[in-house]
Amino acid sequence: MSNELRIFPPEVHSPHKTTLKAVLSTAAGREFHQYMDIESTGNVDIDKDDLADAWCIFFIHKMMETGGEFSVTGPGRLSRSLLVNLDRYAEAWNRWMPNVFHRVTIHAAERDDSAVPQRDEAISCFSGGLDACFTAYRHRKGLAGPQTLNLTACVMFQGADIAENNQEHFDKAFSKARELLEDIGICQFYRIRTNFRNMGMDYEMTYHTMLMGGMRVFTSRFGYFMAGSEGSYDSFSYPWASNPCLLYTSDAA
């Protein structure tokens, strides 16, 4: 038995709701089943070609726990530049935590970056917290100078700060966050429910790949993906999930 990331076709429930599923199988016989339930105030519209990018980022730390070669099967083609960046990402984590994370080689159907639609719109994670509000406001009001992005949508993860099964708490937080976003002109708001934490990894070391993997299902709709930073260039620590040294390797196509 070899290491395999198997991606399943999207389950489209309505124009506003889609479920994505994938399973990571290791040569040792372990399996990690993951899902993303995606709902939106508008249409979801998932492009199957984007699924390989999304799930490879989503599972990269679990792959590194095993190490070795992984084949990716099912719908989706992995962006060439992302494949290179994930190799850099794995190399860095292997240097920082060699007893936990190992180098990996990913074999997948590839697509040249020129095949990925070039969009100027951005999507950002939005929890309703101070860092998320600052990021959204800063870009919507054009306060980031040359780095200002055309932020048109946000996404909130159920299974991150709020537990996957705490529906009542999440619904209240989502409703409040939606009001905040509408006040600054953002009407496209996604919710992604996921069982990422069930993989049993150190969340503080791995959560950023959940956020980026979740947003990368929209590669064909948005050209930029944002999340509030845990630290600045002059005050950050590593190893840590979100740090300026490695953000480009998972954020950029």
Predicted regions and their residues:
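RNA-binding accessory domains that recognize and position tRNA/RNA substrates
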Residues: 1-121, 138-193
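Catalytic-loop motifs flanking and including active-site residues across diverse enzymes
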Residues: 51, 55, 131, 207-211
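A short acidic (Asp/Glu
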Residues: 80-86, 134-137, 165-166, 201-203, ...
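Glycine-rich active-site/cofactor-binding loop and its immediate structural neighborhood
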Residues: 123-135, 139
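Loop-centered beta-sheet repeat module
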Residues: 184, 190-225
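Acidic, Ser/Thr-rich peripheral helices and adjacent loops at domain boundaries
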Residues: 243-247
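Conserved small/polar residues in nucleotide/adenosyl-binding loops
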Residues: 248-253
